[in-house]
Amino acid sequence: ADMKYKCLIFDLDGTLVNSIHALTYCTNLSLEKFGLGPLTEEQMMTIVGDGYKMQMKRSLAACGDTDEAHYEAILPVYMEIFGKYCNYEMHPYDGIVELTSKAKELGLKIAVVSNKPDAQAKKTVEYVFGAGYFDTVIGEQEGVPKKPDPSGALKAAKICGADPSECLYFGDTNTDMKTGKNAKMTTVG
């Protein structure tokens, strides 16, 4: 069968891996240093997905710090804690390993595009799937606009040698669906 698609691009958190435990754990450790929190995983579900700065802003607001008194101070604290514990209770969703290994068998390229800081995105993917499993992993970097801007997705397609029309984009949020659309890719989610 002639496959129309050459490349599968995945969001990381909430799509490939269940990271809500890690995000909640690291956020609460950070909040605790300022005498705030803790937040529940249910609360965190509504807070994450738009990068760590937005996550901290919303977390502080959820704890009553709406004037962002601790916002500047908490960012480096969170980054340090997250660097250590970004893979806390991290595991892939059911069926993901099967899906990605099947894709590899068929000769498709697989990529990850995430709003998670680049170093942690790479670290998490390597921790869960092993080194070199994905053809490319792109996290949030200086100078690359965050999703729903399509820059990351388009960069991944280019690295994988695929035209956007030959890419399937998998995600779990509205942000992801917009990203795929903006990149002119077929979205799944």
Question: Where do the model's predicted regions map?
Answer:
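A metal-dependent, Asp-based hydrolase signature
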Residues: G49-K84, D94, K102
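Residue-level detector of anion-binding/catalytic polar loops
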Residues: G37, K109, T186
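Short glycine/proline-centered loop/turn elements that form peptide/ligand docking sites
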Residues: C26, V97-E98, K102, T173-D176
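Short, acidic loop-to-helix structural element flanking the phosphoryl-transfer center
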Residues: K4-K6, E80-V112, D118-K122, P150, ...
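Active-site neighborhood of HAD-like aspartate-dependent phosphohydrolases
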Residues: D2-T46, K53
